């Protein structure tokens, strides 16, 4: 059973991915068999694993930092924006359709949760340390009921959660308060 640590943010672009990448490297150098995990990622560009599965590039960088090959279980749900309020949904590395944001969150995200759980179980049984990255902010109450990437994952994995905030830039969390 892997030890787990989770990072969530006050918003997107606060540094969760780079921090998770750094920690993957640190744990790897300390001798832990480490794996990154992000249940759901949104990105225009993806990476194709040697098994032909699409995953987010951030998880690829994190896998490289951990000294392992990227695998689909690191990022079971990938949303690739296709236009105004819609995305191509990639589940376990394979495209399954294009959904509006509303359709995805109300009809599909909880269906994808089964694959997320399977991925967590696989990683948990094959690694010593799991570095888990949330997405956006856990405080987005409009998404809470169908959340498959933040607090639901924290509860599912029983991982301690660290909140990341950004003080740099025009739209930092401190300027929103």
Question: What is the role of each PLM region?
Answer:
Residues 1-176:
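Flexible phosphate-sensing "switch/lid" loops adjacent to ATP/NTP-binding sites
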């Amino acid at each position: 059973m892997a030890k787990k640590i989770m990072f969530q943010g006050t918003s997107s672009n606060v540094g969760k991915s780079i921090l998770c990448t750094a920690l993957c490297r640190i744990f790897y150098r300390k001798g832990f068999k480490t794996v990154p995990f992000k249940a759901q990622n949104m990105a225009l560009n993806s990476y194709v694993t040697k098994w032909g599965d699409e995953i987010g590039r951030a998880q690829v960088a994190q896998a490289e930092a951990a000294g392992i090959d990227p695998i689909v279980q690191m990022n079971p749900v990938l949303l690739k924006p296709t236009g105004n309020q819609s995305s191509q949904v990639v589940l376990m590395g394979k495209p399954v359709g294009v959904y509006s944001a509303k359709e995805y969150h109300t009809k599909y995200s909880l269906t994808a949760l089964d694959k997320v759980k399977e991925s967590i179980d696989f990683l948990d049984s094959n690694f010593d340390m799991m570095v888990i990255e949330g997405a956006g902010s856990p405080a987005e109450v409009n998404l809470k009921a169908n959340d498959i990437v933040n607090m639901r994952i924290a509860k599912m994995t029983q991982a301690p959660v660290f909140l990341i905030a950004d003080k740099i830039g025009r739209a930092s969390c401190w300027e929103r308060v």
